[in-house]
């Protein structure tokens, strides 16, 4: 029996909303890391002001940076709880962002000049369908996926993860993230355990996007590593990349 994937995913993120920004690697609050992400947006987005749809916007990290750069941003997320946090941040900063509650596969009509996402594609039950829907609302635009290699069950990965967890416990580091998706949900997420960007690139191409380019985000990786005290930075570093394509 196939679970209610959207309902399960929505409930999971609603439950995580109040803790999300306190979890390691989620919020873009460090100035050096924010500068790296700002530079990435400048590289890959059309010149401002452009109409940008941020899919899976969460608590608004990327939406806020894009708005700061002068773009007209629409933030889409399945979780009302996550968007509530994003709205509060936007109000505090005076950022004019439109917020829409909904699934990635059913974006608002647009049209948009660019569709962006950060660490969201792995949560999609049908990535090709979602990417196709994004192309429909950005018929002359581009898509920018900011992703990473989060999967991996090899012995080295397990050892690193164990050491990181031990260091956090010893140091008493706060991380209220309430754990991984239920296994019954993960089994239905095609990109949940990818260890290379190839499956993301293949899904983008299968959705009809063209001129697909892949770029390693070494500046973002370095900034994220510097954010963490030694030795957590090197231990938690993962390859990150941008996948950019045209409609």
Locate predicted features.
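A short acidic, Gly/Pro-enriched loop at the edge of an enzyme's catalytic core
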Residues: 105-115
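Core SAM-dependent methyltransferase catalytic element
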Residues: 226-247
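A short SAM/SAH-binding and catalytic strip from SAM-dependent methyltransferases
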Residues: 114-127
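A short glycine-rich, Lys/Arg-flanked "PGG" loop and its adjoining helix->strand segment in the class I
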Residues: 128-142
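Class I SAM-dependent methyltransferase SAM/SAH-binding core
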Residues: 53, 59-106
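Conserved class I S-adenosyl-L-methionine
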Residues: 1-47, 144-174, 218-220, 235
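Short alpha-helix
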Residues: 190-208, 214
């Amino acid at each position: 029996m196939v679970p209610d994937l959207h309902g399960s995913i929505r409930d999971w993120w609603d439950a995580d909303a109040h803790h999300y920004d306190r979890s390691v690697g989620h919020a873009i609050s460090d100035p050096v890391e924010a500068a790296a992400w700002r530079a990435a947006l400048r590289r890959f987005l059309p010149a401002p002001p452009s109409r940008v749809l941020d899919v899976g916007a969460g608590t608004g990290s990327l939406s806020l940076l894009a708005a700061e750069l002068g773009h007209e941003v629409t933030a889409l997320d399945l979780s009302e709880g996550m968007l509530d946090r994003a709205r509060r941040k936007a109000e505090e900063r005076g950022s004019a962002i439109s917020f829409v509650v909904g699934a990635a596969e059913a974006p608002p009509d647009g049209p948009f000049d660019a569709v962006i996402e950060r660490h969201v594609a792995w949560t999609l039950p049908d990535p090709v369908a979602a990417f196709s829907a994004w192309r429909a609302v950005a018929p002359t635009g581009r898509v920018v996926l900011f992703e990473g290699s989060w999967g991996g069950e090899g012995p080295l990965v397990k050892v690193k993860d164990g050491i990181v967890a031990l260091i956090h416990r010893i140091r008493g580091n706060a991380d209220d993230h309430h754990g991984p998706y239920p296994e019954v949900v993960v089994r239905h997420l095609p990109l949940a355990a990818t260890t290379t960007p190839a499956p993301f690139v293949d899904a983008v191409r299968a959705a009809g996007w063209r001129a697909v380019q892949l770029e390693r985000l070494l500046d973002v990786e370095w900034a994220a590593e510097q954010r963490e005290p030694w030795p957590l930075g090197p231990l938690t570093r993962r390859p990150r990349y941008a996948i950019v394509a045209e409609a």
